[in-house]
Amino acid sequence: MKFELDKQDGRARRGRLIFKRGVVETPAFMPVGTYGSVKGMMPEEVADTGAQIILGNTFHLSIRPGTDIIEQHGDLHDFMNWKGPILTDSGGFQVFSLGKMRKITEEGVHFRNPVNGSKIFMGPEESMDVQRKLGSDIVMIFDECTPYPATHDVAADSMRLSLRWAERSKQAHGDNPSALFGIVQGGMYEDLRQESIKGLTDIGFDGYAIGGLSVGEPKEEMMGTLDFTEPHMPKDKPRYMMGVGKPEDIVEAVRRGIDMFDCVIPTRNARNGFLFTHSGVVKIRNAVNKTSLEPLDAKCDCYTCQNYTRAYLHHLDKCGEIQGARLNTIHNLHYYQLLMKGLREAIASETLDTFVSEFYQARGEDVPAL
């Protein structure tokens, strides 16, 4: 992977990630394909929304269907018929989410298979091995996601364990040609975030992610943590904010110098009739949409908005039709990619302030201070 940085507007950055499988323009949003599928979408449809890279889930894919069957197809790209690059997370967050079903030690994590209850162990070496077999273009180190809230001592112990796992991940990654990203941890504590960044940069990675955010903290605390973390991150490497997020959170993070994002929000919310538009959120199952002949978003050129009314989408949702979830997902993913394209163009032309002002004005909101 090669990272090129073309332009800056304030702290915001315009660049690209170059892979053998294609170029990813940044800032970029990655749709989530947990089980090797972006829910409800064909790979070609995902690409048609403008997505250039997607995310796969190491934890879930290692359990179902397992790496053996995926390797028989070639790799994850072949298995799911996705032609572009794929980033795989390490499985750390999913293991963290298991709660009492897992036990963390220095070596790694012992946990129960959530499907059949069998005992499984995953550490840095196991995670790197799975991601190598998946053929990931970007591999994430194995880390512990610090719980929220956490005391300084708990956050420090967790972050330092993640640093030791980062070193082991780098060693286990070995000569794998895929890019390897480190993950900054440290809870909501400035000194711990800085210690994490120094430890990771001393090891050396191809990119750096910010983990442990969007885990239940207030938005102000999330952005405050980003404000004191981002300035210490390497300028010549891509920055990835994991699990974020809502359109306004992406806009604010781009203003603060972040290059990459992923989140299940656009696809999950689509299946629940919660749709994103230039003027804000539309809850398609609300009665006001029952007789509306308007498109979902007049400024959107996606297949859904060009061909269907709000009344039709409301009808499909009320009837529980699969087609409704598909059309909603096509729109939400397209909206996110339009947002990213707009951000990229604004940074390139040094008009980001205007873009941000118009983004919030259309939603009837004030621009948050940086």
UniProtKB/Swiss-Prot annotation:
Chain residues that bind substrate: 89-93, 143, 185, 212
GO biological processes: queuosine biosynthetic process; tRNA wobble guanine modification; tRNA-guanine transglycosylation
GO MF entries: metal ion binding; tRNA-guanosine(34) queuine transglycosylase activity
Keyword Coiled coil in record: no
Cofactor needs: Zn(2+)
Active site: 89 (proton acceptor), 262 (nucleophile)
Known EC number: 2.4.2.29
InterPro entries: ArchSynthase1/Queuine_TRR, TGT, TGT-like_sf, tRNA_ribo_trans-like
Residues at which Zn(2+) binds: 300, 302, 305, 331
EC class of the enzyme, as a word: transferase
Domain of life from the UniProt record: Bacteria
Presence of the UniProt keyword Zinc in the record: yes
Cofactor note: Binds 1 zinc ion per subunit.
Region called RNA binding, residue ranges: 243-249, 267-271
Assembly and interaction partners: Homodimer. Within each dimer, one monomer is responsible for RNA recognition and catalysis, while the other monomer binds to the replacement base PreQ1.
Function in brief: Catalyzes the base-exchange of a guanine (G) residue with the queuine precursor 7-aminomethyl-7-deazaguanine (PreQ1) at position 34 (anticodon wobble position) in tRNAs with GU(N) anticodons (tRNA-Asp, -Asn, -His and -Tyr). Catalysis occurs through a double-displacement mechanism. The nucleophile active site attacks the C1' of nucleotide 34 to detach the guanine base from the RNA, forming a covalent enzyme-RNA intermediate. The proton acceptor active site deprotonates the incoming PreQ1, allowing a nucleophilic attack on the C1' of the ribose to form the product.
Family label: Belongs to the queuine tRNA-ribosyltransferase family.
Name the UniProt record assigns to this protein: Queuine tRNA-ribosyltransferase
This protein's encoding gene: tgt
